[in-house]
């Protein structure tokens, strides 16, 4: 059906980049579109980037009580290790072009990053709570993209006040939009010991994180836009 009145579009949540395989221009050019709240979305004046957040509630990493407990008991940033954790990353089977590409990219990145003297690797998968205990010990956490740029690990790290490290993707826009602490590299070749030592001394602001990780923050953004555009 044709939409003939102003609207705010909300879509989610998917590990795939929204613009993969098709153009989103018809949506963005719709004359009545006010804003589009979207996961794994490119930067655009009409798009508000949404996080994919934590795992589904049926999985251990989606249990709200467990997440809240980990957050409440997190180690203060200044007491964490001045090192980077490279957690265990699933290598996606090549069931799709995205899965094949993600698997190959992760294998290459893991080989390169695990050789760095300031990086500690987690070779085997741990139960979620044990994994979060390990994560909490480090100031910095590698977040290698999967079938899409956004992954749950970004938010697991932020919940523990660890700094996520990503390759430069559309995720840099999400972090910038919501004022979240994070490091982004155009190539892993640019991550060396001298640069890392400089990053250790940065003053990271985790103030916006605790608000951002609540559903209310995103709901309030939507309500604010609704109120601003009444009678549009």
Where would I find each of the regions flagged by the language model?
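Short loop/turn elements that flank and shape the SAM/SAH-binding pocket of Class I
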Residues: 191
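Nucleotide-sugar donor-binding catalytic core of glycosyltransferases
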Residues: 1-155, 159, 163-183, 194-232
């Amino acid at each position: 059906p044709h939409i003939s009145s102003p609207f705010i579009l909300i879509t989610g949540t998917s590990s795939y980049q929204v613009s993969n395989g098709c153009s989103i221009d018809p949506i963005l050019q719709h004359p009545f579109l006010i804003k589009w709240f979207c996961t794994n979305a490119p930067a655009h004046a009409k798009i508000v980037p949404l996080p994919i957040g934590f795992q589904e509630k049926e999985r251990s990493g989606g249990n709200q009580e467990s997440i809240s407990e980990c957050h409440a008991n997190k180690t203060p940033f200044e007491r964490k290790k001045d090192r980077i954790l490279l957690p265990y990353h699933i290598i996606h089977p090549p069931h799709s072009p995205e899965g094949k590409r993600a698997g190959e990219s992760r294998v290459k990145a893991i080989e390169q990053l695990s050789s760095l003297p300031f990086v500690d690797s987690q070779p085997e998968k741990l139960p979620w709570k044990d994994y979060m205990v390990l994560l909490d010990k480090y100031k910095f956490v590698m977040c290698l993209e999967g079938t899409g740029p956004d992954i749950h690990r970004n938010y697991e790290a932020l919940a523990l006040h660890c700094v996520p490290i990503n390759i430069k993707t559309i995720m840099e826009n999400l972090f910038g939009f919501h004022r979240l602490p994070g490091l982004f590299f155009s190539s892993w070749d640019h991550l060396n010991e001298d640069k890392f030592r400089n990053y250790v001394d940065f003053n990271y602001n985790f103030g916006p994180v605790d608000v951002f990780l609540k559903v209310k923050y995103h709901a309030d953004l939507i309500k604010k836009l609704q109120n601003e555009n009444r009678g549009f």
